[in-house]
A protein has these predicted regions:
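The beta1-alpha1 cofactor-binding region of Rossmann-like NAD(H)/NADP(H)-dependent oxidoreductases
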Residues: 34, 54-65, 97
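Substrate-binding pocket helix/loop in short-chain dehydrogenase/reductase
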Residues: 91-92, 96-101, 126
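Active-site helix of classical SDR
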Residues: 115, 150
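Conserved glycine-rich Rossmann-like NAD(P)H-binding loop of the short-chain dehydrogenase/reductase
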Residues: 22-38
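Conserved glycine-rich cofactor-binding loop
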Residues: 8-9
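Residue(s) in the substrate-gating loop at a strand-loop-helix junction
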Residues: 134
Length: 229
């Protein structure tokens, strides 16, 4: 069984469909139950099985409940992908400290909360953990200091826990995508969906389904790191 955070759209939804197509039972975790229900219906229409767990990754108790519910429903938990995140943008002088805190609360501390929630189940199954970083964590660029810093922190965290969890038989894969088709660039600094068009040229953007296929392959192979471009 597989649990994916940020599963209501973009990479998360594509991952859910990809795992379900392989026959995995999938738990869908995100804030928007209506969008999760749509992904669930898509999976079930294709003959798969999915469970909806409406939860924000800033809610540690909710994440633990989602992990326990998934393990109970599917008889264990084998793969978890910590994918939930959003992007704060703006020049340093224009952003408030609260903007940086909000960015790290979801992108960094949300990953920690997710890992802590699922870890007992993954240790039991000697499973696989995927953490979605970003190519943006490898460099700096104007107006994205909050997002880039949060993803750099995620990449460093993932490298550290890779070594910690290896002794438990749990593999950790740091997944670093470039531009992938998703709603992340249509979300404002408060994490709210705006519906604005993606400003990145379409020829630079990888289809979510293709990115998800590469990510699933890396998780099956228990690769420590993968770059998706």
């Amino acid at each position: 069984s597989v649990m994916i955070t940020g599963a209501s759209s973009g990479i998360g939804a594509a991952l859910a469909r990809a795992f379900a197509a392989e026959g995995a039972n999938v738990a869908l975790v995100a804030r928007r139950p209506d969008r999760l229900d749509q992904v669930r219906r898509d999976i079930e229409a294709a003959g798969g099985r999915a469970l909806v767990c409406a939860c924000d990754v800033s809610d540690a108790e909710g994440l633990r409940a989602a992990a326990d519910q998934t393990a109970e429903a599917f008889g264990g938990l084998d793969v978890v992908v910590a994918n939930a995140g959003f992007g704060v943008s703006g020049c340093l002088e224009a952003l408030e400290m609260e903007d940086y805190r909000r960015q790290f609360e979801v992108n960094f501390f949300g990953v920690i909360a997710t890992v802590q929630a699922v870890l007992p189940h993954l240790i039991r199954s000697k499973g696989r953990l995927g953490v979605v970083g970003s190519l943006a964590g490898c460099f700096g660029s104007p107006t994205t200091s909050a997002y880039n810093a949060s993803k750099a922190a995620v990449m460093s965290l993932t490298e550290s826990i890779y070594h910690e969890l290896d002794e438990h038989g749990v593999s950790v894969t740091c997944i670093n995508p470039g531009f992938v088709a998703s709603e992340i660039r249509s979300v404002n600094n408060q994490g709210k969906y705006t519906g604005n068009p993606d400003p990145v040229p379409r020829w630079l953007v990888l289809p979510a389904e293709r990115a998800a296929a590469d990510m699933v392959r890396a998780l099956h192979r228990r690769k420590p790191v993968v770059f998706i471009t």
